[in-house]
Amino acid sequence: MPPQQQRGRGRGRGPGGPGGPGGPGPEQAPEDPDRESGGERRRGRGRGAGRGGGDKAERAQAETEFQERVVQIRRVTKVVKGGKKLSFRAVIVVGDGNGRVGVGVGKANDVIGAVKKGVSDARKALIRVPLNKINSIPHPMSGSSGAANVFLKPASGGTGVIAGGAVRTVLELAGIKNVLAKSLGSKSPLNNARAAADALSRLRTLSEVAGERGVPVSNLWSR
């Protein structure tokens, strides 16, 4: 056998080679800091609430604060190449009764799916409504959506919600207790609900108006 091949064979476990007598021994894997002396892997012993546990609890609590009301469930038809496709459309209003309200629409092949989509859409369209001490709006305001127009006017304590249909649902879930409302134009529940939400989104407090004009709030009260 040539001397070069003999040297190549002797490198395996010969004297002084890796794994041989007097050699450095076989390569070992790096130690795992999470593995104990018995070979078992240590489990985490942190004191945290878990991965995302706190966020889930806060999200669940926020969901329970909102109330959901179905304004309308309607069967709709879409003409496609193969014929007519039937589905359901749900108009949903979501609010916490403390100044937050939203209007959403959902469409699906069944009623339950349409309601779920409507609730999700309404939560994405939440608006903040400024309320005064008697749970009324700070000033008159009007809103529109399509051919529907809604006019809102503040009322004194004990008046109640003078409104009907979808407009009343939006006002109640927003937490308004005393208000006068008038609907003009279209009688569509969806357009009336959106018109009411549009009017509420335009409301402003005295402090906001004073900040925009650069004057103290007392000047607005004197007028």
From Swiss-Prot:
Q: Assembly and partners?
A: Part of the 30S ribosomal subunit. Contacts proteins S4 and S8.
Output the PROSITE patterns linked to this UniProt entry. Answer: RIBOSOMAL_S5 (PS00585), S5_DSRBD (PS50881)
What task does this protein carry out? With S4 and S12 plays an important role in translational accuracy. Located at the back of the 30S subunit body where it stabilizes the conformation of the head with respect to the body.
Any single GO CC term annotated in Swiss-Prot or TrEMBL for this entry: small ribosomal subunit
Gene this protein is translated from: rpsE
* Keywords of the record: Ribonucleoprotein, Ribosomal protein, RNA-binding, rRNA-binding
In which residue ranges is the amino acid composition biased (Gly residues)? 13-22
Q: What's the protein called, per UniProt?
A: Small ribosomal subunit protein uS5
